[in-house]
Amino acid sequence: MMNKALRSTWQEFQYMISQINNKTNQIIIFKCIQNWYFDKKKLLSLHLIEEFGLEELVNIDIKNYPLEKSECTLEDIKRFLKIQPCSEECMIVWLRDILWELVVLSIDIKCEYCFKLEMSALFDADNEIVFLECNHCGWVKTVDGCSIESIKNIRLATNQDLKLAGLI
């Protein structure tokens, strides 16, 4: 259950998003969410912020990531925000998921395991390669199509990583 201050904070977030023009690009949307987050961060639980990796997404240097290639639209976010989170944890997860959709490049490639379209491009820091992860089942493969057993050190793929991999 969310306390009154958190419910009010979520309502402010919904209102802020509702005031953004539908033709606004993803970079401006990201900056609006980022500014709201920095303003409201003190109201959120640090352990939940850390647990769900919110800081990694909200603190990116936007010029290094493919936000302009994001398929996440303001309309998608507005539809998503019509639902009220039942807890602070849910609110932070939703915020993280919105930022993820804006920051991580989504590729329309069919997963060879579950056969769904849509994989996320991420970076294997140990092997220094971009890999694709299915957004539905989590199956991973290299950009060349080779299956990968496990990846331990994952980070967001930058524009440079994606260019070298031939994805942008």
Feature map (PLM): residue ranges:
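Short terminal alpha-helical segments
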Residues: 1-36
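Short cysteine-rich clusters marking metal-coordination/redox-active sites
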Residues: 111-114, 134
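Short, charged early-sequence alpha-helical segments and their helix-coil boundaries
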Residues: 43-84
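Short metal-binding segments enriched for Cys and/or His
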Residues: 137-155, 162
